[in-house]
């Protein structure tokens, strides 16, 4: 089920405050966040946000095509460990 149209998109308050401060000063710096559920809004365009994937923070540059998506969509949490080269049983 999607979010109601009557409600505004969710953006964590601490993230919104940091972005608005940077926009007022017209500065660009990496913003570190754990808030993967925050929606990307137009005021974030042009900023680099380091999103936590459970292990580390991945820096993501926000473009206009990302507006409306969640931050967590751009920081994958799972990585595939390759099978051993000489392990024939697992490659069947």
Swiss-Prot record:
GO terms for biological process: ribosomal small subunit assembly; translation. It is found in: Plastid, Chloroplast. The keyword Transmembrane helix does not apply. It comes from the Eukaryota. Pfam families: Ribosomal_S19. GO terms for molecular function: rRNA binding; structural constituent of ribosome. GO terms for cellular component: chloroplast; mitochondrial small ribosomal subunit. Keywords: Chloroplast, Plastid, Ribonucleoprotein, Ribosomal protein, RNA-binding, rRNA-binding. The keyword Cell membrane does not apply. PANTHER family: RIBOSOMAL PROTEIN S19P FAMILY MEMBER, SMALL RIBOSOMAL SUBUNIT PROTEIN US19M. Protein S19 forms a complex with S13 that binds strongly to the 16S ribosomal RNA. Belongs to the universal ribosomal protein uS19 family. This is Small ribosomal subunit protein uS19c. It comes from Lemna minor (Common duckweed).
């Amino acid at each position: 089920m999607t979010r109601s149209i009557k409600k505004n998109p969710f953006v964590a308050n601490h993230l919104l405050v940091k972005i608005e401060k940077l926009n007022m000063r017209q500065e660009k710096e990496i913003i570190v966040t754990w808030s993967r559920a925050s929606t990307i809004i137009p005021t974030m365009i042009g900023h680099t946000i380091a999103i936590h994937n459970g292990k580390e923070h991945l820096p993501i540059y926000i473009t206009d095509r990302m507006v409306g998506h969640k931050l967590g969509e751009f920081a994958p949490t799972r990585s595939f460990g390759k099978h051993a080269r000489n392990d024939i049983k697992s490659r069947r």
